[in-house]
Amino acid sequence: MGRRRRSREMALQVLYQMEMAVLPPEEALGLYYQLFDDDEKHRVPAEVRPFAEEIVRGVSLHRARIDEMITSASEHWRLARMSLVDRNILRIAVFEMLFCFDIPPKVSINEAIDLGKTFGSPDSGAFINGILDHILPLLEANGRIDRRDSA
């Protein structure tokens, strides 16, 4: 499994913890490291941490904007009705599409679908794909993705 994939998985777990326990990013990250650093088998490798932390902090900082985009693209679904896992996977992908210029949007979408299949319900992959497929053209139309290869 690649470094960024592991970073996304870690970020998903931390974002989930933040929402469940109503924790700020730094506290949630600290608890995550505390929990896993003592366990050799599950210790988070140093190379995974920076991107995971960037995602966690970025999603937290830009959450209102990210949630607004998800809400506008999700017909008949309020954000609060979405599963906690799906909602945070969507947040990660939208954060990447908005702020991680070195990651092609299609990669962010495919990674989100894979995370949904791994951590979500049997329908999560298709649900996540549908929402992100609505968001991508909006970003392209607003010139947000013109600096990257979206193919």
From Swiss-Prot:
GO cellular component: cytosol
GO function terms (MF aspect): RNA binding
Alphabetized Pfam families for the sequence: NusB
UniProt xrefs under InterPro entries: NusB-like_sf (IPR035926), NusB_fam (IPR011605), NusB_RsmB_TIM44 (IPR006027)
Taxonomy, superkingdom: Bacteria
Record key words, sorted: RNA-binding, Transcription, Transcription antitermination, Transcription regulation
Example of a GO biological process term: transcription antitermination
Disulfide links within the chain: none
Keyword Transcription: yes
SUPFAM superfamilies: NusB-like
CDD domains in alphabetical order: Terminator_NusB
Family from the record: Belongs to the NusB family.
Chain's role: Involved in transcription antitermination. Required for transcription of ribosomal RNA (rRNA) genes. Binds specifically to the boxA antiterminator sequence of the ribosomal RNA (rrn) operons.
UniProt xrefs under HAMAP family: NusB (MF_00073)
Protein's recorded name: Transcription antitermination protein NusB
Source species: Syntrophobacter fumaroxidans (strain DSM 10017 / MPOB)
Gene responsible for this protein: nusB
